[in-house]
Swiss-Prot record:
The keyword Lipid metabolism does not apply. A motif (LPXTG sorting signal) lies at residues 492-496. Residues 1-32 form the signal peptide. GO terms for biological process: carbohydrate metabolic process. Its main location: secreted. The modification Pentaglycyl murein peptidoglycan amidated threonine is found at T495. Residues 361-376 have a biased composition (Basic and acidic residues). InterPro entries: Fim_isopep_form_D2_dom (IPR026466), FM1-like (IPR048052), GramPos_pilinD1_N (IPR032364), Ig-like_fold (IPR013783), LPXTG_anchor (IPR019931), Sgo0707-like_N2 (IPR046473), SpaA_PFL_dom_1 (IPR041033). It holds the Pfam family GramPos_pilinD1. One of its GO terms (cellular component) is extracellular region. Residues 56-76, 329-376 are annotated as: Disordered. This is Fimbrial subunit type 2. Keywords: Cell wall, Fimbrium, Peptidoglycan-anchor, Secreted, Signal.
Length: 534
């Protein structure tokens, strides 16, 4: 059945044209009460094509017939968004009265911004809904389509949104058909209507604080600043919840979050946010006072620093990512904060950052020991320093700064086996930034080991400073073996085998002297007797 009524057409053009201005991104000139409309085919089935983009330059990006008007100014397409079209009861587009009702919905506040607050039960004053039709998810180009739509008026709600979209599109009403009254359009009825709702996106970033600020050895902290730039929300759009969430590696102990700031100003725990810890998972969840500050500071940087103390090395790579879990709603007044979902679908997640560590074992041995497996020496004392050239290809024993400390101690002593194990020494991290004490993906880092005291009875070596090369991972860096030689001491009383040998030799010499003396005496006596006989 077809209707061809001039009054009907004018009301339709005026109502539908005005109604969809914000959704379609059309300028006010798009409405034309004297449109050259054609017949409405009430038996036809139409479609709604949704083009979903981030907010761009604020100018219209397309027309109801699908022609683009501002390709350069539109924001990036948004995939993964789903829309539902709810058929409105009580609006008959076959009558002038029906189009008058559509026209009334163009009045300010006629379509509440929170009409879709509960997608399962949308609300529209003075109207109910008959049935609904759901689009597929928007594709990589930001497009989705609802097909086979009868000639009706529909409330359209954004009913599924990716986690990185902080502000949904406002609900809107669309008619099938729609008068094609845009500039340079032909004024006919469009049964395949295109709309261009927009979103506000939010992102989250993570880095690693320069390790020089926190130490280079086991017991030092690794700190991960997590930040987001706050979007501008509509006046009657409010945060339902806003949370930073970070699950830290098991090799980090005493995990927590500190230094929560907004635009560089510190926020207060309890007053502005709640700190939660569940095992290795740490959350910073903003309360009503904090959410109000977030809404009131668009464009400002919100940051929290997650941290833990290094206890061991494992494979050498301590990886970390964080999530931002947030949502908004349209309301007349700020709603009470809701509890963020524990496992939301695809929340904004930071890129992975990595802090790399290695370990070091040294063994002090007796340099005079000629056995294959030398015994360790207890009581040798060492200090360890950063190397002046930390990332030299060949490490040198030139130290930089003060000795490294563990719990305030800078001198470490060999135990019963003659060993000291440094369970973790910093190698590098994945953050490239000018001025950091770091080289991304460095294969090793140089340290300097200094022996400050030899074990009792042993001599401190002349080369007490030794260059050490530490590689990422436990047990990767070869054990360092350091010799000590015994002290020189005065001669001892000779009571052993060597003394007996000397005594024997001395006795033999005395005996030879005695025998020689006897022989000489006898020779002289015989000579004297011969002389007397003569």
């Amino acid at each position: 059945m077809k209707y061809n009524t001039s009054t009907l057409g004018r009301r339709a053009a005026a109502a539908a044209g005005v109604l969809t201005l914000a959704v379609l991104g059309l300028a006010p000139m798009a409405q034309a009460e004297n449109a050259n409309h054609g017949d409405i085919n009430t038996e036809a089935l139409g479609s709604l094509t949704i083009h979903k983009h981030l907010n761009g330059d604020g100018n219209p990006i397309g027309a109801p017939d699908g022609t683009a008007s501002n390709d350069d100014g539109k924001g990036a397409p948004v995939s993964g968004v789903q829309f539902t079209a709810y058929e409105i009861n009580g609006i008959d587009l076959k009558t002038s009265e029906g189009w008058a009702k559509v026209n009334a919905l163009t009045n300010t506040g006629a379509i509440p911004d929170n009409a879709c607050a509960n997608p399962g039960q949308p609300t529209l004053p003075n109207y109910t809904f008959r049935s609904s039709r759901v689009s597929g998810d928007t594709d990589r180009d930001g497009e989705a389509k609802i097909e086979s739509l009868p000639v009706k008026a529909y409330l359209v709600c954004e009913t599924k949104t990716p986690g990185n979209i902080v502000q949904k599109a406002k609900p809107f009403v669309v008619t099938i058909p729609h008068p094609n009254t845009a500039a340079k359009a032909d004024g006919t009825w469009l049964y395949d209507v295109h709309v261009y709702p927009k979103n506000e996106k939010i992102e989250v970033a993570k880095t690693i604080e320069d390790q020089r600020n926190n130490g280079y050895i086991v017991g030092s902290k690794v700190r991960f600043p997590v930040s987001s730039t706050l979007p501008k929300l509509d006046d009657n759009s409010y945060y339902k919840y806003y949370q930073f969430k970070d699950t830290l590696d098991n090799r980090l102990k005493q995990v927590t979050a500190t230094d929560v700031t907004l635009g560089g100003t510190r926020l207060d725990e309890g007053t502005d946010y709640t700190l939660g810890t569940d095992g290795q998972t740490v959350t910073v969840t903003f309360n009503q006072n904090g959410l109000s500050k977030l809404k009131g500071n668009p464009g400002q940087k919100l940051q929290a620093v997650f941290e833990g103390v290094v206890s061991e090395v494992g494979d050498g790579s301590i990886n970390n990512t964080a999530q931002l879990i947030s949502d908004t709603t349209y309301a007349e007044q700020p709603p009470a904060p809701e509890t963020p979902p524990a496992n939301p679908d695809n929340p904004p997640t930071t890129e992975q950052v990595t802090s790399k560590w290695g370990d070091l074992t040294i063994k002090k041995v007796d340099g005079n020991d000629r056995s294959g497996d030398k015994d360790g020496l207890k009581g040798a004392e060492f200090q360890i320093y950063k190397a002046k050239d930390a990332y030299a290809d060949t490490c040198s024993p030139e130290a930089d700064g003060q000795p490294l400390t563990i719990n305030g101690e800078s001198t470490f002593t060999t135990g019963e086996g003659g060993t000291i194990n440094f369970k973790a020494l910093f190698v590098s991290d994945s953050v490239q930034d000018t001025g950091r004490d770091n080289r991304v993906d460095a294969p090793h880092r140089c340290y300097v080991l200094v022996e400050t005291k030899a074990p009792a009875g042993y001599v401190l070596p002349a080369d007490a400073s030794r260059a050490i090369t530490v590689e990422p991972g436990a047990g990767v860096t070869q054990q360092v073996v350091i010799d000590n030689v015994k002290q020189s001491v005065p001669g001892l009383p000779l009571t052993g085998a060597n003394g007996m040998l000397i005594l024997t030799a001395s006795g033999a010499a005395l005996l030879m002297i005695a025998v020689g003396s006897v022989l000489v005496a006898r020779y002289r006596e015989r000579k004297r007797n011969r002389d007397l006989a003569a």
